[in-house]
């Protein structure tokens, strides 16, 4: 059975995945509980289904790979990485390597950032988009979508909301 490639990340209301300094401190809810969906998002449950995490070099340099110590992690970089169990440097052929893993039945989590995931979007390789919309307008930063994309039609599979955060889960038609 074929696996899936899943993009899962937070985005400001105006489309940024980090602020202009590369920070993520703005990723939190508004603290209100008036509106909440019956279902809840569980990142832990999501991760149980994931076999491989793919992230960019900046995410790696910020230590984000450390939260996935029980997963295989691929870093999108052409530079060598320190010898470490579970880390793999993936360069120019990242998309085709990830597609090979998907065809082996592995579920892949595209963690970020924008430059790393852009080729997957442009080649329409993402099976599932899970986007958490954070109730903040940053005004500037690094955008999720880098532009020059063609139309990709998706189907809304789930919508979860709590504390002002809306998590949208889209799948391919």
Task: Give residue spans per PLM region.
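Enzymes that bind and transform nitrogen-containing heteroaromatic metabolites
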Residues: 1-173
């Amino acid at each position: 059975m074929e696996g899936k490639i899943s993009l899962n990340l937070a985005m400001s209301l105006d489309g940024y995945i980090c602020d202009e300094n590369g920070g993520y401190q703005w990723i939190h809810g508004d603290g209100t509980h008036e509106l909440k969906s019956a279902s809840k998002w569980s990142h832990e449950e999501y991760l149980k289904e994931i076999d491989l995490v793919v992230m960019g070099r900046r995410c790696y340099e910020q230590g984000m790979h450390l939260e996935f110590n029980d997963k295989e992690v691929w870093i999108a970089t052409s530079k060598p990485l320190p010898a470490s169990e579970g880390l793999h440097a993936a360069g120019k052929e990242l998309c085709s390597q990830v597609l090979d893993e998907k065809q082996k039945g592995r579920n892949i989590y595209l963690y970020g950032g924008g430059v790393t995931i852009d080729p997957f979007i442009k080649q329409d390789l993402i099976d599932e988009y899970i986007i958490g919309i954070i109730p903040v307008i940053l005004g500037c930063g690094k955008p999720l979508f880098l532009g020059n994309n063609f139309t990709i039609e998706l189907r809304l599979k789930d919508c979860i909301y709590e504390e002002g955060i809306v998590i949208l889960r889209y799948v391919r038609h």
